[in-house]
Design a protein with these regions (language model features):
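Active-site-proximal substrate-binding core of FAD-dependent oxidoreductases
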Residues: 18-52
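Short inter-helical turns and helix N-cap capping residues of alpha-solenoid HEAT/ARM repeat scaffolds
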Residues: 113-114, 145, 162, 193-197, ...
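Alpha-helix capping and helix-loop boundary segments enriched in small/acidic/polar residues
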Residues: 1-5, 27, 112, 160
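A conserved FAD-binding loop/helix module that cradles the flavin
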Residues: 1-17
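Charged, amphipathic alpha-helical linkers/stalks
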Residues: 40, 47-87
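Structural detector for internal amphipathic alpha-helices that build alpha-solenoid repeat scaffolds
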Residues: 81-97, 107-110, 116-131, 139, ...
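C-terminal/domain-terminus segments
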Residues: 289-308
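Amphipathic alpha-helical scaffolding segments comprising HEAT/armadillo-like alpha-solenoid repeats
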Residues: 61-78, 98-111, 130-155, 178-192, ...
Length: 319
């Protein structure tokens, strides 16, 4: 059923690339979009009405007000179907219009008496860089008795790369970029064990990375040691020229439950990279990263190289 769509998309991309080379010095952003649309209409890739369509952005104030109202019903659970949560369009409206949305979100946050709705608005405001809901987010993280539901990396499409409710509040807290979040985030980190789901590690490391500070280095190093997070790498023997017998580790895959080897590596590397980015402590972060540059899992090796060479795993535009 998707074949016609893919064919049309492929033709459109090819046409755009050709126009860029012929008429825009290779810059696709500079091509004449109307001319491209006319060609695609001529070839029945697009309907004729497209030539009369106008840009919908920026949206009207009324649309933004309605979107903010709709977000009262935003849920925090994992859903893939709109019948469970149809607020995602409203969220897109708000996120794409931050300047207009923030005053409305702040008003809605202040006026609501429902804790779950207040948390909704606090999360959105934090992601938009506004600290109005900081107290609510900190309290939500502190009051969560544990981490709740979480998932390891696995071969399951629905849950392999997602976050649980507490994970999502922790990530939102990280967006505040304030020293006030260090203590609650470290407290949440210390609740984790080696067997804790990977999604919890990803959430707290992402949140702390957005608030990285030298004061976090020693607690992170202690966490690595006390939680037995170190030593899960599989260094390939051919890197050691003095070693006569060369081992050839088999890269471990994942199953429906995940697989401990790959997930344990993931956890160790995330915390070590965060430690390194916070200034390191007794070179512990660097030592782990250097070992992983020779790991059998190439994606971990590449990640370790990236952090060591750039001092961070986040681009200059991302954090």
């Amino acid at each position: 059923r998707m074949q016609p769509d893919l064919q049309n998309q492929g033709y459109a991309v090819g046409m755009a690339a050709a126009m860029a080379v012929l008429r825009a010095r290779g810059k696709v952003r500079d091509i004449d979009i109307k001319a491209l649309q006319k060609e695609l209409v001529r070839n029945n890739c697009l309907e004729k009405r497209v030539l009369k369509d106008v840009d919908s952005f920026p949206l009207s104030q009324a649309s933004i007000i309605e979107a903010v109202k709709t977000l009262e019903a935003l849920t925090i659970d994992v859903h893939q179907k709109p019948q469970h949560d149809d607020t995602h369009k409203a969220l897109a409206v708000v996120i794409s219009h931050p300047q207009e949305s923030i005053p409305l979100l702040k008003k809605a946050y202040t006026q609501t008496s429902k804790p779950e709705v207040k948390l909704n608005y606090a999360r959105i405001l934090a992601i938009l860089g506004n600290q109005t809901g900081k107290k609510t987010l900190i309290e939500a993280v502190k009051k969560a008795p544990d981490w709740g539901k979480g998932w390891d990396y696995s071969n399951q499409r629905k849950y392999a790369n997602t976050f649980g409710p507490v994970d999502r509040v922790v990530i939102a807290l990280g967006f505040l970029n304030s020293a006030d979040v260090h203590a609650p985030l470290l407290e949440k980190l210390n609740q984790l064990t080696l067997k804790s789901p990977l999604s919890h590690y990803k959430a707290v490391c992402l949140a702390l990375r957005m608030n990285k500070d030298a004061s976090l280095a020693e607690p992170l190093a202690r966490f690595l040691k006390e939680k037995k997070l170190k030593g899960h790498n599989q260094t390939l023997g051919y890197y050691d020229i003095k070693k006569k017998e060369k081992n050839v580790y088999v890269r471990q895959g994942v199953n429906q439950e995940g697989g401990s080897m790959l997930n344990n590596k993931f956890k160790e590397l995330l915390v070590a990279a965060l430690l390194f980015e916070c200034g390191d402590y007794l070179n512990q972060g660097r030592e782990i990263l250097e070992v992983y540059t020779k790991d059998v899992n190439g994606h971990f090796a590449e990640y370790a190289h990236l952090v060591l060479n750039n001092g961070t795993a986040i681009s200059s535009t991302g954090g």
